[in-house]
Regions:
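Short, low-complexity, Lys/Arg-enriched N-terminal segments of secretory-pathway carbohydrate enzymes
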Residues: 1-15
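Extended effector regions of multi-domain proteins
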Residues: 15-132, 136-231, 235-362, 366-499, ...
Length: 783
């Protein structure tokens, strides 16, 4: 301290303060820089905690379509109204299905009865009256003598008035051809329970503690085989028993019952045969008598599967990497590029309506490109799976899935697995084998995706570098549903390309059916051993589609274009000759002409063109090619009674004249009427007088695959390499490729200074967004 009382600050403290000040200034500058950079980074790469999630887009855009209410399935309210209306008709003597017996009258199914095509087009194009809403009601009339199935059409008036009903033409239908339902199952269960109660010890000893009743968590369950006999006069089925475990179809036991259950008098239903361990017996008592005798028959023992269960989906095996990484995800930076109004979809230049038929599955209507109808109806008609095997069940198992109401088996879809997380999901409602409408959540999905390949591209080089590049990613719209009939899950896709093409795909996955391997069977005759003493049965999967094309109007013809070779003189260098590929076109004039397409001739590649006499600006007839890329041969003889259930499976392609009496190629009843199918597809084209030139045409397309199960199909069949498909491809329909209208094309060329100049109307450096989180979840209830 000096004489004036002031404090002398040492120089070292002054230096320390100065350094500290500079450090603070530097830290402040650094914080400012970090804040600016972080702000820029956050704007470009927002975190999950930010609100900058990807937009949903506009899903309901513009005025409601004129097709609203035309193709939509009946709502729950409409289904209930139709049910209550029919229950009030005292002359029908109806009971509710939960209180009904086989000998009663009850409603089996209610669904939309689509309006006639002519009435729809009169409304859409001529502004005539809107077609009335109608319901198809199927009633099992067990009280009749004889009992039968009767179909009714219930109509709602467009204006004031009461609902009406009338019998549908072509009815009644014989009782024995009706589909399987809960009422029959209850009656069969009593027969099975009586038989398995007697055989309790046999089942318990043979199957390691498993039995049909009083076995706690070691239960067996049964499955009927179709068809139910050969003719309409009989109704029989083999019941296969499997363990009630995950993947039950991979856990069969060698015990089967042959049930005779015709008519409505259940007192006459009985067991005609019993199969056990490769042997058959007339009755359960006969089997037990032999079983209890010392060494009288060969006894079976099939041990219960061990834990972890081989047929389960629970993850097993070694992880593919030590540190699991999340898989790539789809996202939509600007929201969805398609709009939805009810069941009406608009995407780019495409638009269509869709519904879910309870019997046959997905149906698309009024498919337009650039607001011009190309297809009136594109729909799944039927699916079959015919099996081979040693046991009586598999010798007789030939499934026609429409007979099991496969359209009702469109269960919930899981986002991120079954469909991309960005999908728009739709509920469906059915009234089949129930007393109340059943709403199935998220049964259909619609999404846009990048197909992973350019729709078009070209790289032009001058030898030393490039001159230009042009390309367009193939982004498509997909409508998907998955139908699960017991063990198989069939994925059905309708894919819309910006080129004007439509791809239709059917992809089987799920579990295979299997039987216990038998030592006396010739090696690999009916399939391979896919697990310990378990045979994966050989079978096919064939799908049938209806394609009601309206190419530039309803007046169409079809030509067959064959590619062959021709020995041609080279007039430019005589006397040389050349073998050249040539086109040879032949107009199919009669329905019987198109029915001749029963096989694919690889010696003469063939294309089928449905065309209009209207021409494009190059004087070519506007047309659409039908390309059944996955045609599969029906190996069973054409006149075999099993083939007669699905005669369409013989023909890769048939073209017929549109008729209101030929709306479906199969029916709810074809499964159980093999020798006399209720809908005989071959009758569609047996007349030699039905011309198919310049008329409204319908194409019927079959695709499929033959399945040889292998050990890799356990626990589940992979979808890879199993897809069956066909294309509908524009053929001189447009004056140029319609994808040239796309705003997503990329064009790159060099400027004068040799720098790259990229042209695209969609900028890639726009602000990004975070995909919304999607919780994997199932509703699990259908009420």
């Amino acid at each position: 301290m000096n004489g004036k009382g002031s404090v002398v600050v040492p120089i070292k403290w002054k230096i320390a303060v100065a350094i500290l000040f500079l450090l603070c200034v530097g830290l402040l500058i650094a914080l400012i820089v970090v804040a600016v950079v972080f702000s820029q980074y956050r704007d470009k790469y927002p975190s999950d905690t930010e609100s900058n999630t990807c937009a949903e887009g506009i899903l309901n855009e513009g005025e409601p379509p004129k097709t609203k209410g035309i193709f939509n399935d009946l709502t729950s309210e409409e289904l209930i109204a139709a049910r209550d209306f029919m229950l009030k008709q005292s002359s029908l003597k109806l009971k509710r299905i939960e209180n009904a017996s086989v000998k009663d009258n009850y409603i089996y199914m209610i669904q939309l009865h689509p309006p006639e095509k002519a009435a729809v087009l009169d409304y859409l194009e001529e502004d005539k009256a809107k077609p009335a809403r109608k319901a198809l009601v199927v009633i099992f009339e067990g009280e009749g003598s004889p009992p039968f199935v009767q179909e009714y059409i219930v109509t709602w008036p467009n204006n004031s008035g009461e609902m009406t009903y009338e019998k549908r033409n072509g009815n009644p239908i014989l009782f024995n051809v009706r589909p399987y339902d809960q009422v029959q199952r209850k009656a069969l269960t009593k027969i099975v329970l009586e038989a398995t109660t007697k055989a309790f010890r046999l089942l318990n000893e043979s199957y390691d503690g498993f039995c049909y009743h009083n076995c706690t968590n070691k239960l067996l369950k049964f499955h009927p085989q179709g068809p139910f006999g050969k003719t309409r006069d009989e109704r029989t089925t083999w019941l296969q028993f499997t363990r009630d475990l995950e993947g039950g179809s991979l856990n069969p036991v060698d015990f089967q019952l042959y049930i005779d259950f015709p008519g409505s008098d259940v007192s006459k239903w009985k067991i005609n045969k019993v199969y056990y361990n490769g042997q058959t017996f007339n009755t359960v008592d006969d089997l037990l008598f032999q079983y209890n005798k010392l060494n009288a028959i060969s006894k079976s023992f099939i041990p219960a599967p061990k834990t972890p269960l081989f047929s389960s989906y629970d993850p097993s095996g070694i992880p593919l990497s030590q540190k699991a990484r999340r898989s790539p995800r789809m996202f939509e930076p600007d929201g969805k590029r398609f709009s939805v109004s009810g069941r009406h979809i608009k995407y780019m230049q495409w638009s269509f309506d869709f519904r879910m038929d309870s019997v046959s599955g997905p149906q698309l209507f009024d498919i337009r490109f650039k607001d011009k109808r190309i297809i009136y109806e594109l729909s799944l008609q039927e699916a079959i799976s015919f099996y081979s095997g040693f046991s009586p069940y598999f010798m007789a198992a030939n499934f026609v899935y429409g007979g099991w109401a496969m359209g009702t088996k469109t269960f919930e879809l899981v986002g991120g697995v079954d469909c991309p997380e960005t999908s728009k999901f739709f509920d469906v409602v059915h009234f089949v084998d129930t007393d109340q409408p059943q709403v199935i959540k998220n049964a259909v999905c619609v999404f846009e995706m990048d197909s992973g390949i350019p729709l078009r591209r070209h790289f032009e080089t001058n030898g030393t570098g490039y001159k230009f590049y042009e390309g367009l990613a193939s982004r498509v719209l997909v409508l998907r549903t998955i139908i699960t009939v017991r063990n198989y899950d069939n994925i059905f896709d309708f894919v819309f390309y910006q080129s004007g093409a439509i791809e239709v795909k059917s992809t089987p996955t799920g579990y295979v059916q299997s039987e216990n391997d038998r030592p006396e069977v010739e090696d690999d005759l009916f399939g391979h051993e896919i697990h310990t003493k378990l045979l994966g049965n050989l079978h096919d999967q064939i799908f049938h589609y209806k394609v009601d094309l309206d190419v530039d109007g309803r007046s169409n013809s079809i030509e067959k274009i064959e590619i062959s070779t021709q020995d041609t003189a080279n007039d430019w260098l005589p006397p040389e000759r050349r073998i050249l590929k040539v086109l040879r076109s032949q107009v199919m004039r009669l329905e019987t002409d198109s029915a001749e397409v029963k096989k694919i001739d690889f010696d003469k590649p063939t294309f089928f063109n449905v065309y209009s006499d209207n021409k494009n600006k190059f004087d070519s007839k506007r047309g659409y090619l039908i390309q059944p890329l996955s045609a599969v041969k029906q190996l069973l003889p054409e006149n075999y009674f099993i083939t007669k259930m699905a005669p369409w499976s013989v023909y890769p392609l048939v073209v017929t004249r549109y008729k209101e009496t030929e709306l479906r190629s199969s029916s709810l009843y074809n499964q159980n009427s093999p020798t006399q199918p209720v809908v005989d597809f071959e009758s569609f084209f047996q007349s030699a007088n039905d011309r198919i030139t310049n008329v409204d045409l319908v194409a019927w397309v079959s695709i499929g695959c033959i399945e040889i199960p292998s050990s890799e199909d356990v626990p589940n069949v992979a979808s890879a390499a199993n897809t069956a498909r066909f294309f509908l491809q524009p053929f001189n329909y447009f004056d140029e490729g319609p994808s040239t209208d796309s705003s997503n094309a990329v064009f790159i060329k060099q400027d004068e200074d040799k720098s790259n100049v990229a042209q695209s109307s969609v900028l890639s450096d726009e602000e990004v967004c975070v995909p919304k989180k999607y919780d994997i979840n199932l509703k699990g209830s259908y009420e």
